[in-house]
Amino acid sequence: PEHEYYRNKSKKTDGNIYLKANYDLTSTLSAYADLQYRHIDYTIDGVNDKYDWNKNALRPLAVDKKFDFFNPKVGLNWNITPNHRLYASFSVAQKEPTRNNYTDGDPDSYPKAEKLLDYEVGYTFANPWLTAGANFYYMDYTDQLVLTGALNDIGEALTENIPDSYRMGIELMLGIKPCKWFQWDINATWSKNRIKDFVESLPGYHYNADETVTSLPTVLIKHKDTHIAFSPDLLLNNRFSFNYKGFEASLQSQFVSKQYMTNAEVEELTLDKYFVNNLNLAYTFRPKKILKEVTLGFTVYNLFNEEYENNGWASSDYTDTVENRGNYAGYAAQAGTNVLGHVSFRF
């Protein structure tokens, strides 16, 4: 109370140098290279809004970090015919922690920058009425900042560095336009998102007869090849679009598979799969005076009143012995069927 903890001083200096080159190896085969160098100087000085009960004071914020990143990207494009294209690329992406990563982290072990090695190979096809594509990717992470399932004091999601993890999968897309007034677009991603070696920290407690609580030693549990939190294996998006003489209609559908809410892959701490549909209807007309165009419409969200949660928090601990494990979760339930109207004017 009566302490302006938010008046800490922060300064971030970000410098970038880019170099880009393209080269035609043949009339149908080309290569490219994008090079980026980044230098970041990041300082935070002051106190945090978190209280250190051992020192009887607000936690200090003393961040003085410098980052130097070299992020190259190289690739090949092969235009086999005017309709068919193959491509391949390799890139490095490095990213510094955000301010929240520092303020929510442990001052004795501030978060590290994450590094990604990205490998991609893909194919696309396009003609006037059909587009299709497939993209295969493998993303190899060092110190990836992943969600933990926990929240800070104001409800923001917390993250932690994971030394060795990966995301791999295939992205598929299809677009069909058989006539002027109808189009069908669909895309899907199947992925495998894993932590190779995860060490779970499980706090323990003993509940005394006088209703006080005694903290027990934190137990470290090793896990192999666990799901990354909030990373579904399957995403599917579908859209039907109609457009005829000023009338527009579209039906958007999304399927999301089961998600784990922590990185320990606990079956009790998951978000169930869900399938949600939104319907949009609109009509556009052109008045003869003043306005060039008027659009009237409405959107019905969650058309079939699906009961689902798309976010939440989760944690675990033990009482007296590790075998007496407790798992806890909170869920962000989403709205049922709801309607939003809209009007737009063009002068």
Language-model-derived ranges and their functions:
Residues 1-79, 97, 200:
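Signature of Gram-negative outer-membrane beta-barrel scaffolds
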Residues 31-35, 72, 86-88, 132-134, ...:
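Transmembrane beta-strands of outer-membrane beta-barrel proteins
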Residues 229-289, 304, 309-314:
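C-terminal beta-barrel architecture of Gram-negative outer-membrane proteins
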Residues 79, 85-91, 112-183, 189, ...:
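Membrane-embedded beta-barrel scaffold of Gram-negative outer-membrane proteins
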Residues 27, 138-140, 160-263:
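Gram-negative outer-membrane beta-barrel transporters
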Residues 37-41, 90-96, 127, 136-142, ...:
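Transmembrane beta-strands of outer-membrane beta-barrel pores
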Residues 28, 83, 129-131, 181-182, ...:
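Short loop/turn motifs that connect adjacent beta-strands in outer-membrane beta-barrel proteins
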Residues 194, 255-261, 283-347:
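C-terminal beta-signal and adjacent terminal beta-strands/loops
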